[in-house]
Each structure stands twice: as structure tokens, then as C-alpha cells.
Amino acid sequence: MMHSKKLTLGICLVLLIILIVGYVIMTKANGQNAQIKDTFNQTLKLYPTKNLDDFYDKEGFRDQEFKKGDKGTWIVNSGMNIQLKGGALKSREMVLYINRNTRKTKGYFIVGEITKDKKGYTHDKDKKYPVKMEHNKIIPTKPIKDEKLKKEIENFKFFVQYGNFKDFKDYKNGDISYNPNVPSYSAKYQLSNDDYNIQQLRKRYDIPTKKAPELLLKGDGDLKGSSIGSKDLEFTFVQNKRENIYFTDSVEFTPSEDTSYESN
């Protein structure tokens, strides 16, 4: 009888320990998920910034990577990528380097195409058109004979100019993950076609599918903040071996001397 009581007590103790450990792990995971979501939310607060000139006066996260006196450079990038069944992956994107020191902005409009030959080798072809930005207007810096392309460049709008994540904290059922070894983190949400941002994308791009996309937020670097890390967002409408349709966007704040445009 005494042995039976001890056995029962032992089992109860083990179960209690399992419950406590499980609770601690769950609490830690929930706290980490909330921190990841809050980290993304800090970046998403920039949406919308309708006038790109406003970035000259916007301060970003600063750390020891910034030299004394460097006001930093904002890098904004938006692009639509479409691969129809069995075809090439075609992309049209723009990147701007908004230098807060010089209060000048330069960048590129990039037309890309990725194909595979019969042997399975990948071929990447890009055509860059240099641009500058003045008074919130995109201006090609070299002559462009194709009038349609010229208008496309001049009328280009970055997602940060019209996207809006005011309800991001209310997003539910997200698949949130964290890899401490990199470190990297991500959050994925299934959206509907009624979502404001999706309606805006469909208004501006000819998206050849009615499927509602997933929103994937990706980040790397210290969760508490780092000028070395990056944060990107991606709306994935279709993703498989033969067909891909997705929109990418990023807004980063970096030391001015680290920007790829400045070093070219």
C-alpha cells in the first residue's frame, strides 16, 4: 500500500514537472513571438510614407556601425515577379538610395529575366536604368527611347508610398519562427483578396491569378535592432516549380558608406 502511494506520488510529481516545464516553454515562445511581431511592427509603421522626400528627415535605428556625423541612408525597394507556367521569371523593380547626408537620391529601375536552358542551367539577365529622385518624382538620368518604359519609370510608386499596416497587431494565426543560430526570424500570414494592401497591388499590377496571397515577413540580425540586419516582406500569390507570382518590398536604414549604389 505504501509502495502504491509512493508510486502515485512519483507519477504526480513527474506530471507536475512536465506541466511546469511546458508552461515555461510556452510562455517563453509566446513572449518571443510577441517580440518578433513587435520588431516587424516598428518597420511597418513607415507604411505609408507617401512623399519619399520625407525620408531625408526620418531617423532609423542607429548603432556602433554608424560613423560619427553619418546621418545614414534609406534604401527602398519594390518589385513584381511573375513566372507563368514553364516560362521565364520576369521581374520589374526599382531601388532608391536616399542619402540623408547629401539629401540626394539615386537608384535604378531594373528589368530582369531568369531562364533555364535544356541542360537545366540558369541564366540571369538584368537591364538597369539609372534614375534620380527630386521632389518626390522619379527621373531617368539617361535617355530612354521606349516612351512606354520611360512613363512606367516616371510613374513608379514604391509599396511604402501606398501600403498600410495599421491593423498589423490584429493579424491572427501567424506562423512565427525564430532561428537563434543565424539569427533570423519570420512571420507568415494568409491574407484575403479583401485586404487593403492586396487591393492596392491588384490596382497597380496585372496579377495573373485570383488566388489570395500569403504575406511573409523576413528578418535577420539582433531582434533588439541592428543596422547589419535586414527586414523584407513578400506577398506570394503562387509558388511552385513551374509558376511563381510574388511581390517583394523592403525599407532599410544603413550606414551611408555601406550602400551598394555608393560603392559602384
UniProtKB/Swiss-Prot annotation:
Keyword Membrane: yes
Compartmental location: Cell membrane
Keyword vocabulary terms for this entry: Cell membrane, Membrane, Transmembrane, Transmembrane helix
Bilayer topology: Single-pass membrane protein
Transmembrane segments: 7-27
Chain coiled-coil ranges: none
Protein name according to UniProt: Uncharacterized protein MW2407
Source organism per UniProt: Staphylococcus aureus (strain MW2)
